[in-house]
């Protein structure tokens, strides 16, 4: 705290911006003492502990996901989560709806993959209708220790699959996919929305405050995604959802459009503008 006050006295900032986490506390507290305008950015649909502590004290909460659960009387605006240029390159990519031609399913489970997501997806393949098994091509992110097991399950199902621990070109693959199966991290939600793809979301049950379920809410309520909790997740349930989307070009196209409607491709600029305005005006 004293260090933060010394830094403020030296640097004389016109605004202080926090992104959550305990290291932000001293600067935000010191800014309050010095009556410097403060903003916090929350990437998830539920505020983290530090952002929750300051939500009613700062000028505004910049929300990366919408809706976001907020304390009463907290001022907030949906600005979105900034994404990489590699994602923006495929913003609102033309969507090829499912039909009687090769179809692409992208399965991603966060930065290090997810055993339950990849395994359940692999086991769901044998439960799909024959026309889907014949047409489907799957790109599945898998934890390194699970690769051999998942490869065998896909092979036994007869569905063509590319199995990798990490895909360097997820945005490109997502732009080519008819459907995405994904965890509900804030970055994944932003990518799916900006590129504009139908999705089946499987929130990570152990996420702090169950924030991944909250992250899913906007896409689900807009009709862009289906959500399956880990407690509900089985190969049969997942196969039914995959079949539902990939058997209807109208439904899939509607979901893709709904995803784009939730996107914030200009999130970085919106956030920067917010900072500049509050920095100049003080509120």
Please tell me what each predicted stretch does.
Residues 264-283:
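C-terminal alpha-helical cap of glycosyltransferases
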Residues 92-179, 213-217, 221, 228-238:
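Donor-nucleotide binding loops and adjacent catalytic segments primarily
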Residues 13-15, 175-190, 197-198:
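Acidic donor-binding loop of glycosyltransferase active sites
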Residues 29, 171, 189-197, 217:
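Short alpha-helical segment that forms part of, or immediately flanks, the ligand-binding pocket
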Residues 32-92:
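Active-site-proximal region of nucleotide-activated glycan assembly enzymes
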Residues 251-265:
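A short, well-ordered alpha-helix in the C-terminal region of glycosyltransferases
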Residues 1-15:
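An amphipathic, basic-hydrophobic alpha-helix
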Residues 36-37, 178-179, 196-204, 224:
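Structural loop-to-beta junction motif characteristic of Rossmann-like glycosyltransferase folds
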